Amino acid sequence: MKFAVIVFPGSNCDVDMFHAIKDELGEEVDYVWHDTENLDEYDAILLPGGFSYGDYLRCGAISRFANAMKAVQKAAEQGKPILGVCNGFQILVESGLLPGALMRNENLKFMCRTVQLRVENNETMFTSQYEKNEIINIPIAHGEGNYYCDEETLKQLEENNQIAFRYVENPNGSVSDIAGIVNEKGNVLGMMPHPERAVDELLGGAEGLKVFQSILKQWRETYVVNA
């Protein structure tokens, strides 16, 4: 399986993503600059955290216009796994690939610590290696991670089982404690916590690795077992 890590000006978690795939998952991965127009050779696309374009205007508001995002849109339509973490989640929302918005944290402070998440849906291509309602420890590092959507959108997210992760103790004011959501098709996941920072016990924990293992499992079952 071959992954692409999209690198925007200001990305700073791209190396962590690369490490998670190459060294922990053991799969092929490339850094791909934001001006690329073709992602056809890749099986999964990763949008890392950071401060793309300095977070000017709004987090992800400029990145959404990058050439690479047109290719990401195409990949999403093809059903390829798309994972956006932190700033990557913000970019997915700004691009319209996921509903809602990310606002300033309720306490108006940047937060960097490990939090507990509850796995709400383990039937997605990103969460199949977890147990439903499993509690996992994943780091956060954001100033604008307060997820917001209107009541109608929240109702749709809940009815469609699109809420992948919830905070056990809400750190930022996100509506309904939401930490991560998938699109209706189930192949695009956006989450504020950083699973790529929790893939090695030496770094404090490896409970985020199952996100990437789930992607790999789904791909193998689809393209290898059925080959």
Swiss-Prot record:
Record pathway: Purine metabolism; IMP biosynthesis via de novo pathway; 5-amino-1-(5-phospho-D-ribosyl)imidazole from N(2)-formyl-N(1)-(5-phospho-D-ribosyl)glycinamide: step 1/2
Superkingdom of origin organism: Bacteria
Record-annotated Glutamine amidotransferase type-1 domain positions: 3-225
Protein EC: 6.3.5.3, 3.5.1.2
A Pfam family matched in the record: GATase_5
Reactions that this protein is recorded to catalyse: N(2)-formyl-N(1)-(5-phospho-beta-D-ribosyl)glycinamide + L-glutamine + ATP + H2O = 2-formamido-N(1)-(5-O-phospho-beta-D-ribosyl)acetamidine + L-glutamate + ADP + phosphate + H(+); L-glutamine + H2O = L-glutamate + NH4(+)
Protein name stated in the entry: Phosphoribosylformylglycinamidine synthase subunit PurQ
Organism this protein belongs to: Bacillus cereus (strain G9842)
